[in-house]
Amino acid sequence: LLKKKLQRLAARLLSRPASIGFHKNTEMPALLRSGDLLVHPSIADLESVSVIEGMAAGLVPVIASSPLSAAGQFALRDESLFPVDDVEALARRIDWWVDHPDELSKWGEIYAEHTKEHYSVAASVRKFVAMEREAIADNANKQINA
């Protein structure tokens, strides 16, 4: 019942069809790229993978700043954060991005590049190798000083 209600509302309000429901992993990059913003109003979120996926697709995130969520760490500017449970602040953030399409486009590219540099598989491997080398060096220093 709610799904049908949302679909009718989306058909009336949106200029392009809304995709409500579950989607295959292979469909997600294109689906994400079809959006304008990634709104992440979660109160609690430990990993925030959806935020990283959206950013990788070039979406600017609008993230709830919550002590129970890791998502806020991904915001690169104040316009990407709003206080959790503050719907008026959320609306202001969305409106800001909609009212500044050049900034939205520019920051979509910045978020995508930032995600590639810091959260891609290649970036994760580089960080892991650096951490492993540091641990080996620390262990070698402990043995020398023992």
Regions found by a protein language model. Name each.
Residues 22-23, 30-35:
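Short alpha-helical donor nucleotide-sugar binding micro-motif in glycosyltransferases
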Residues 4-23:
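Nucleotide-activated donor-binding/catalytic signature segment of Leloir-type glycosyltransferases, i.e.
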Residues 60-65, 69:
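Short hydrophobic beta-strand element within catalytic cores of glycosyltransferases
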Residues 38-39:
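A short hydrophobic beta-strand element within the catalytic core of glycosyltransferases
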